[in-house]
């Protein structure tokens, strides 16, 4: 088994606390509404949203995958940090054991924030992670973030 780590950063004009609340804490409800072309629904399989919670993320018709199951590993409300692992479905299967993800939202002096993202792909055997797989995952995350950001800009009273 190998572990391939990919890190990225992206910025947002939304304050860190508000984005954490909307994108992370309430994302299961908000994202299917603001980005139905990317995620059709999120089901809570077990748990209360904290560590150990299992969620099933369903994708719309025509998407390359029907679903993924995520396990919440950490929710740090003070430091705006969220860790979760993709444990089933989507790209996880013959070549990948799981994908561990860490999102940390850091406030910036201009009132916005930076999202620091780390993705660890845990492969099976000697398999390597393909660049297009990492690119597709990054693009999906960016699509979801921008949809939430647009919603928050249009609804200044939401998720404060």
Swiss-Prot record:
Compartment(s): Cytoplasm
Gene Ontology molecular-function annotations: abscisic acid binding; protein phosphatase inhibitor activity; signaling receptor activity
Gene Ontology CC annotation, any one: cytoplasm
One Pfam family per UniProt: Bet_v_1
GO annotation terms (biological process): abscisic acid-activated signaling pathway; defense response
Main location: cytoplasm
SMART domains: Bet_v_1 (SM01037)
InterPro entries, sorted: Bet_v_I/MLP, Bet_v_I_allergen, Plant_def-hormone_signal, START-like_dom_sf
The entry's keywords: Allergen, Cytoplasm, Pathogenesis-related protein, Plant defense
Functional summary from the UniProt entry: May be a general steroid carrier protein.
Family: Belongs to the BetVI family.
Name under which the protein is recorded: Major pollen allergen Bet v 1-G
Species annotation: Betula pendula
Classification of source organism: Eukaryota, Viridiplantae, Streptophyta, Embryophyta, Tracheophyta
Gene: BETV1G
């Amino acid at each position: 088994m190998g572990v391939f780590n990919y890190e990225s950063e992206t910025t947002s004009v939304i304050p860190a606390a508000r984005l954490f609340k909307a994108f992370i804490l309430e994302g299961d409800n908000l994202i299917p509404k603001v980005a139905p072309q990317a995620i059709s629904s999120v089901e809570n399989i077990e748990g209360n949203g904290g560590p150990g919670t299992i969620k099933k993320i369903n994708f719309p018709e025509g998407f390359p995958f029907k679903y993924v199951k995520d396990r919440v590993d950490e929710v740090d409300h003070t430091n705006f940090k969220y860790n979760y692992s993709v444990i089933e479905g989507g790209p996880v299967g013959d070549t990948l054991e799981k994908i561990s993800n860490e999102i940390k939202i850091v406030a910036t002096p201009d009132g916005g924030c930076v999202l620091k993202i780390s993705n660890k792909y845990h492969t099976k055997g000697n398999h390597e992670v393909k660049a297009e797989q990492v690119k597709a995952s990054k693009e999906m995350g960016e699509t979801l973030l921008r949809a939430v950001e647009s919603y928050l800009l249009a609804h200044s009273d939401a998720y404060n």
